[in-house]
Design a protein with these regions (language model features):
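Helix-to-loop junction immediately C-terminal to a conserved catalytic motif
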Residues: 52
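Catalytic Walker B motif of ABC-type/P-loop ATPase nucleotide-binding domains
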Residues: 163-167
Length: 260
């Protein structure tokens, strides 16, 4: 069996006295494309932050390549795992090319400058994400979908084995949602990159992810393929609405039943 890339065992976490995650255990493997799904407040973003070493669990353990996350050098971890938050506030005016190049920072020593190789890797990341055409534009001048592609390019410039994304298609129109997810699917397929992302659209999750983890009230309800997870009775219980299931091009389709 393939070695787990990241392994979480019995993870619990609370914000002050509010429990958010309760006894979470899961593992990721090479080329997993995992969609974390579930209602608002189910713990998706918090789980991603624990996987990205942004938050420390109150109990349980996280291992990356069989080494405890608490003992791994942060710089080395940043070379292997990249994190893309939902929001990208930029106070200072940076050009797109500068933001992508920031992805090389985990490889730089203090007071050193980017090498020719760093610039080449950043350029390839922009080509892969179709952001080269606005490399010289300022980040705050481009659209939401373009900003998301730039952040993926910066994360890709880290040359990671795993990418963690918090709702990468939030607030984007359908065209940009498909564009972003297609780029991620390409990274997963061609670069063999492991992807874990929080998302709300169950139909897009079914179309692009090879594995879904359904969370509710801080616990894993179901973990498996889209066909194993997107079950009528389970979805109705978790989301509290009636749904119908169908299929299109081999993917499960979830349709809310709207009373008229």
């Amino acid at each position: 069996m393939t070695q787990a890339l990241m392994k979480l065992e019995n993870i619990s976490f609370a914000y002050e006295t509010l429990p958010v995650l309760k006894d979470i255990s899961l593992s990721t493997r090479e080329q997993d494309f995992i969609g974390l799904i579930g209602p608002n407040g189910s713990g998706k973003s918090t789980l991603l932050k624990i996987m990205g070493a942004i938050l420390k669990p109150d109990s349980g353990s996280v291992q990356f390549k069989e080494s405890s996350l608490s003992k791994i050098n942060k710089k080395l971890f940043a070379q292997s795992v990249s994190w893309i938050p939902q929001d990208h506030p930029m106070v200072f005016p940076f050009k797109v090319s500068e933001i992508v190049l920031m992805g090389r920072h985990p490889y730089l020593s203090p007071l050193s400058f980017e090498s020719e190789e760093d610039f080449e890797i950043s350029q390839r990341a922009m080509e892969t994400t179709m952001t080269s055409q606005f490399a010289d534009r300022y980040f705050n001048e481009i659209s939401g979908g373009e900003k998301q592609r730039v952040m993926i390019a910066s994360a890709l410039a880290q040359d990671p084995e795993m990418m963690l994304l918090d709702e990468p298609t939030a607030a984007l129109d359908l065209k940009y949602q498909i564009q972003i997810l297609s780029i991620l699917k390409n990274l997963n397929a061609r670069h063999k990159m492991t992807l874990v992302m929080a998302m709300h659209d169950l139909n897009l999750a079914s179309s692009f992810c090879n594995r879904l983890i359904l969370l509710d009230e801080g616990q894993i309800v179901r973990d498996g393929t889209p066909e194993q997870v997107l079950k009528k009775d389970i979805l109705e219980q978790v989301y509290g609405i009636e749904v119908d299931l169908g299929s299109h091009d081999g993917s499960i389709r979830v349709h809310p039943v709207i009373s008229r």
